[in-house]
Curated annotation (Swiss-Prot):
Cofactor(s) required, per the database record: Mg(2+); Mn(2+)
GO BP terms, alphabetized: adaptive immune response; adherens junction organization; regulation of Fc receptor mediated stimulatory signaling pathway
Reactions catalysed: L-tyrosyl-[protein] + ATP = O-phospho-L-tyrosyl-[protein] + ADP + H(+)
Keywords for the protein's UniProt record, in alphabetical order: Adaptive immunity, ATP-binding, Cytoplasm, Immunity, Kinase, Magnesium, Manganese, Metal-binding, Nucleotide-binding, Phosphoprotein, SH2 domain, SH3 domain, Transferase, Tyrosine-protein kinase
UniProt source species: Gallus gallus
Organism lineage string: Eukaryota, Metazoa, Chordata, Craniata, Vertebrata
Complex formation: Homodimer (via SH3-domain).
CDD domains: SH2_csk_like, SH3_CSK
Localization: Cytoplasm
Limits of the Protein kinase domain: 195-450
Similarity remark: Belongs to the protein kinase superfamily. Tyr protein kinase family. CSK subfamily.
Name of the protein this chain belongs to: Tyrosine-protein kinase CSK
Length: 450
């Protein structure tokens, strides 16, 4: 370890760069790709005391491991850093200057909307190859077909196959970073060879969620094949690298495969979504202590996001998962942004979203608090859809006039009071998650939920 490197504090996560078999009894052997947690620095700064995922402790060499970091906020990650979007033929030629054989980029076709153009510099000229999109496949010569642009570029990188040159050097779009490089740099890139995909456990618009095995551990894997969708999910994965809490679904790593897309690997939550868990068990199985525990689990996760200046924007029982040991964890960080961000998030779940967020796109921790109140109602109604018997188009006008849902059957009055505080129309008068957690802890300690 160089003298310049700062000492890693206890709790720092590292990922192994090489295998280490250990030479002394006190050493902790590990394999490349293992995640280790620093316990303490030793007298020799080149060695740390660390523990592995099963809790075994020992001494490790600092130069064999890499500190895991959050992917930097504000970086534009790209699976396709060579993709420049809507630029003209002339702009592409300027970008590929000075000429360098094999320098290339891909742009949207100006003459054929929906198609793409591969632009390749070759012996002082730029050749433009139309990429035809037909029957959900891409092709240049209508002989070889590809699922997506990444596959196509990968193919012509290994073999010119009729082009003027094979693709040698991507012209990276200014301001973007290749996703694979950034996940590797920050210690989150996993190896596809270590992952076995076992069975589909969920389907989404983006692709499949699969049960997987990563080095002997059960994991959940989001498999995203489509270029544009994968690009959107990169943002979710990069947010997850910055978050660590026992009530947030934990990212284990990311695999970027040119041939087959993006894989986001997270801890496996055996009991599925909280909304399904509540509906399938109901009042006869789940007592008041259990409902309050789930409420507190979610509140603690949200207090952590609040303290770290993140806004979830899509908090609902469908986006909370339940582990084998009945711990509720918040997931689905697809819309999560740093608090300062005001980006439009497209379609919003009307019944869960605060009025000011729907009306003015004003998202804040306080709009998450509104959603938490709706989630509490879901928990205490055992998974009912909020605002029963009110047509969707009438929900917002009624809420803005001050309408609040009645308490679910059997809901303790003190818990209903918490819900109503979350549904205060003025965001400034809603409680913080810190205050909400204190109120829920008080209810638990005094057994007021009975």
């Amino acid at each position: 370890m160089s003298g310049m490197q700062a000492v890693w504090p206890s709790g720092t996560e590292c990922i192994a760069k090489y295998n280490f078999h250990g030479t002394a009894e006190q050493d902790l052997p590990f394999s490349k790709g293992d995640v280790l947690t620093i316990v303490a620095v030793t007298k020799d700064p080149n060695w740390y005391k660390a523990k592995n995922k099963v809790g075994r402790e020992g001494i490790i060499p600092a130069n064999y491991v890499q500190k895991r970091e959050g992917v930097k906020a504000g970086i534009k990650l790209s699976l396709m850093p060579w993709f420049h979007g809507k630029i003209t033929r002339e702009q592409a030629e300027r970008l590929l200057y000075p000429p360098e054989t094999g320098l290339f980029l891909v742009r949207e076709s100006t003459n054929y909307p929906g198609d793409y153009t591969l632009c390749v510099s070759c012996e002082g000229k730029v050749e433009h190859y139309r990429i035809i999109y037909s029957s959900s496949k891409l092709s240049i010569d209508e002989e070889v077909y590809f699922e997506n642009l990444m596959q196509l570029v990968e193919h012509y990188t290994t073999d010119a196959d009729g082009l003027c040159s094979r693709l040698i050097k991507p012209k990276v779009m200014e301001g973007t970073v290749a996703a694979q490089d950034e996940f590797s740099r920050s210690g989150w890139a996993l190896n596809m060879k270590d992952l076995k995909l076992l069975q589909i456990i969920g389907k989404g618009e983006f692709g499949d969620v699969m049960l997987g095995d990563y080095r002997g551990n059960k994991v959940a894997v989001k498999c995203i094949k489509n270029d544009a969708t994968a690009q959107a999910f990169l943002a979710e994965a990069s947010v997850m690298t910055q978050l660590r809490h026992s009530n947030l679904v934990q990212l284990l790593g990311v695999i970027v495969e040119e041939k087959s897309g993006l894989y986001i690997v997270t801890e496996y939550m055996a009991k599925g979504s909280l909304v399904d868990y509540l509906r399938s068990r109901g009042r006869s199985v789940l007592g008041g202590d259990c409902l309050l525990k789930f409420s507190l689990d979610v509140c603690e996760a949200m207090e952590y996001l609040e303290a770290n200046n993140f806004v979830h924007r899509d908090l609902a029982a469908r986006n909370v998962l339940v582990s084998e040991d009945n711990i509720a964890k918040v997931s689905d960080f697809g819309l999560t942004k740093e608090a300062s961000s005001t980006q439009d998030t497209g379609k919003l779940p009307v019944k869960w979203t605060a009025p000011e967020a729907l009306r003015e796109k004003k998202f804040s921790t306080k709009s998450d608090v509104w959603s938490f109140g709706i989630l509490l109602w879901e928990i205490y109604s055992f998974g009912r859809v909020p605002y029963p018997r009110i047509p969707l188009k009438d929900v917002v006008p009624r809420v803005e006039k001050g309408y609040k849902m009645d308490p679910p059957d059997g809901c303790p009055a003190i818990v209903y009071e918490v819900m109503k505080k979350c549904w205060t129309l003025d965001p400034g008068h809603r409680p913080s998650f810190h205050q909400l957690r204190e109120q829920l802890v008080h209810i638990k300690e005094k057994e007021l939920y009975l």
